[in-house]
Amino acid sequence: MVHLTTLLCKAYRGGHLTIRLALGGCTNRPFYRIVAAHNKCPRDGRFVEQLGSYDPLPNSHGEKLVALNLDRIRHWIGCGAHLSKPMEKLLGLAGFFPLHPMMITNAERLRRKLAREVLLASQKTDAEATDAEATET
């Protein structure tokens, strides 16, 4: 268990610690720091510790980069820190937690939508092929 120092307790004044994303970067180029911060502090304000980073824009290889200090995340969760919803989803994708239920639901919806589009495209090409054969004869 972590003991909060008196200096930290004075600035704390109730609430709880939250592991969340702090926005950085510039216009049209977001970059997030994964931080442990008090829930009363502003989103981009003071934080207790930086636990990683997240770059949501794909790089030249189509990858979204995430750096996590899983030992420190495990430590803060053990100390009673709460997770924000985006962090729950991100840690689920990283394999640290089970996948968030909405991630599974959205993946199923997307899979069904893509299957429907492929089926419609194949039916359209079959119809065009039969029309082309009918006009040739």
Swiss-Prot record:
InterPro entries: Ribosomal_bS16, Ribosomal_bS16_dom_sf. Residues 1-34 form a transit peptide. GO terms for molecular function: structural constituent of ribosome. The modification Phosphothreonine is found at residue 130. Keywords: Mitochondrion, Phosphoprotein, Ribonucleoprotein, Ribosomal protein, Transit peptide. Coiled coil: none annotated. One of its GO terms (biological process) is mitochondrial translation. GO terms for cellular component: mitochondrial small ribosomal subunit. It is found in: Mitochondrion. Its main location: mitochondrion. The keyword Transit peptide applies. Component of the mitochondrial ribosome small subunit (28S) which comprises a 12S rRNA and about 30 distinct proteins. Belongs to the bacterial ribosomal protein bS16 family. This is Small ribosomal subunit protein bS16m. It comes from Pongo abelii (Sumatran orangutan).
